[in-house]
């Protein structure tokens, strides 16, 4: 508690245990086959771009170099979270690996299936579809009604949504 004599030291020790985004991403890409010099930012960016190319993902994330040089993180905003899932598709992660990547590397929640785009990404990753196939599905989904949904007092948890998505079959 803040009243303890060594509270500041303990808090600093906890803070020191967190890795910068670039460090966490370094460990991730090494685990996924990067063999180059870990201090070579250009080579790391080229490795990530090669994964995007192999996956057929046309758009590269902005600020990739800054992930390693300026410790810029992927922000927790809907448009920026797409970058997280592009990385999941590029590195061919499964659902569990994608969840771990979100939480342990990006320090964000996993799939937010309350968002249509992320629900589709969950479905696509679960069924081993490509990023481009996921985007095709997203473009076909009707725009949601902006009216509040009456759940009759129930709470719609992400786990409930994913259980329903898990029932869908890929054709």
Give residue spans per PLM region:
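A short, Lys/Arg-rich alpha-helix, primarily the initiator
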Residues: 1-51, 134-154
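A generic alpha-helix surface/boundary motif
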Residues: 23, 46, 81-85, 118
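Amphipathic alpha-helical segments within well-ordered protein domains
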Residues: 26, 85-89, 121
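Short acidic alpha-helix initiation/capping motifs at coil-to-helix transition points
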Residues: 29, 34-35, 75-83, 111-116
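Short amphipathic recognition helices of helix-turn-helix/homeodomain-type DNA-binding modules
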Residues: 95-153, 157
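Long, charge-rich C-terminal accessory regions
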Residues: 159-171
């Amino acid at each position: 508690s803040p009243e303890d004599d060594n509270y500041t030291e303990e808090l600093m020790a906890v803070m020191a245990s967190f890795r910068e985004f670039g460090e966490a991403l370094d460990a991730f890409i090494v685990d996924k086959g990067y063999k180059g010099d870990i201090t070579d930012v250009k080579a790391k960016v080229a490795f990530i771009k090669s994964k995007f190319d192999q996956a057929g993902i046309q758009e590269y994330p902005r600020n990739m170099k800054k992930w390693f040089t300026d410790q810029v993180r992927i922000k927790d905003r809907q448009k920026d979270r797409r970058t997280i899932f592009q990385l999941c598709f590029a590195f061919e992660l499964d659902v569990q690996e994608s969840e771990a990547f979100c939480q342990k590397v990006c320090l964000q929640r996993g799939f937010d299936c309350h968002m249509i785009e992320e629900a589709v990404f969950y479905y696509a990753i679960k069924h081993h579809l490509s990023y481009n196939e996921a985007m095709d599905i997203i473009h076909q989904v009707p725009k949601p009604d902006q009216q509040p949904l009456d759940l009759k007092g129930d709470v719609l948890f992400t786990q409930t949504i994913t259980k329903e998505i898990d029932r869908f079959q890929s054709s």
